[in-house]
């Protein structure tokens, strides 16, 4: 609908209104409602067209081409994934062929010596000062209980460069047997795992060891059951 047509319709409506001024009150009310409806429809149509073709509308924030909004968490994850860690870390496992003794190896699958950590004389050598998570697990296995008390110990020790004395950092003791297996009774198998872990301030050159008192009871059935490691924090 053009502007001229809209003006013409308004003039005709005014003329009709003047001619019927002396008419009934009901006729006047109908005419007013008709005019109101006409202008309402015309205005709504015009507004729809302006919005549809983008003449008016909400403002949009413009960003340079190729720029994307990334949340702080996403930025952190993305940057951390691109940064390779250079912190010392080690994970060694027991030598399965060394029956009767606990010897650590880093040549099996899923073992690791990274960023200057060394394995020397069955000890892990710390390459730099700092906080370290030290952890170790051993698994004991036996058949029946002897007449004497059976105590199993697992100890993680440190020999510091500042003082050449072995100091226990973590130590645990367990007794798998509460009483002796009666004579003639079936000797049932038992299993006793011991896991230890803690965070310690270490110095470059410190030596760490993980030892037990009764290696004959170690369970070497599966690789990875007995392990020792450190992680720089």
Curated annotation (Swiss-Prot):
Ranges of the Extracellular topological domain: 57-233
TM spans (from-to): 36-56
Annotated SUPFAM superfamilies: TNF-like (SSF49842)
Residue intervals annotated with topology Cytoplasmic: 1-35
Site (Cleavage): 34-35, 49-52, 77-78
Annotated protein name in UniProt: Tumor necrosis factor
Ranges of residues in domain THD: 88-233
GO terms for cellular component: external side of plasma membrane; extracellular space; membrane raft; phagocytic cup; recycling endosome
Glycosylation sites: 80, 95
Topology class, membrane: Single-pass type II membrane protein
Post-translational modification as stated in the protein's UniProt record: The soluble form derives from the membrane form by proteolytic processing. The membrane-bound form is further proteolytically processed by SPPL2A or SPPL2B through regulated intramembrane proteolysis producing TNF intracellular domains (ICD1 and ICD2) released in the cytosol and TNF C-domain 1 and C-domain 2 secreted into the extracellular space. The membrane form, but not the soluble form, is phosphorylated on serine residues. Dephosphorylation of the membrane form occurs by binding to soluble TNFRSF1A/TNFR1.
Lipid-conjugated positions (N6-myristoyl lysine): 19
Top-level taxon: Eukaryota
Predominant subcellular localization, coarse grouping: membrane
InterPro entries on file: TNF, TNF_alpha, TNF_CS, TNF_dom, Tumour_necrosis_fac-like_dom
GO molecular function terms attached to this record: cytokine activity; death receptor agonist activity; identical protein binding; protease binding; transcription cis-regulatory region binding; tumor necrosis factor receptor binding
Quaternary structure (record): Homotrimer. Interacts with SPPL2B.
Disulfide bonding pattern of the chain: 145-177
Annotated localization: Cell membrane
Gene (name only): TNF
CDD domains: TNF
Biological-process GO terms, alphabetical: antiviral innate immune response; cellular response to amino acid stimulus; cellular response to ionizing radiation; cellular response to lipopolysaccharide; cellular response to nicotine; cellular response to type II interferon; chronic inflammatory response to antigenic stimulus; defense response to Gram-positive bacterium
Similarity comment: Belongs to the tumor necrosis factor family.
Modified residues (Phosphoserine): 2
Function: Cytokine that binds to TNFRSF1A/TNFR1 and TNFRSF1B/TNFBR. It is mainly secreted by macrophages and can induce cell death of certain tumor cell lines. It is potent pyrogen causing fever by direct action or by stimulation of interleukin-1 secretion and is implicated in the induction of cachexia, Under certain conditions it can stimulate cell proliferation and induce cell differentiation. Induces insulin resistance in adipocytes via inhibition of insulin-induced IRS1 tyrosine phosphorylation and insulin-induced glucose uptake.
UniProt keyword terms in alphabetical order: Cell membrane, Cytokine, Disulfide bond, Glycoprotein, Lipoprotein, Membrane, Myristate, Phosphoprotein, Secreted, Signal-anchor, Transmembrane, Transmembrane helix
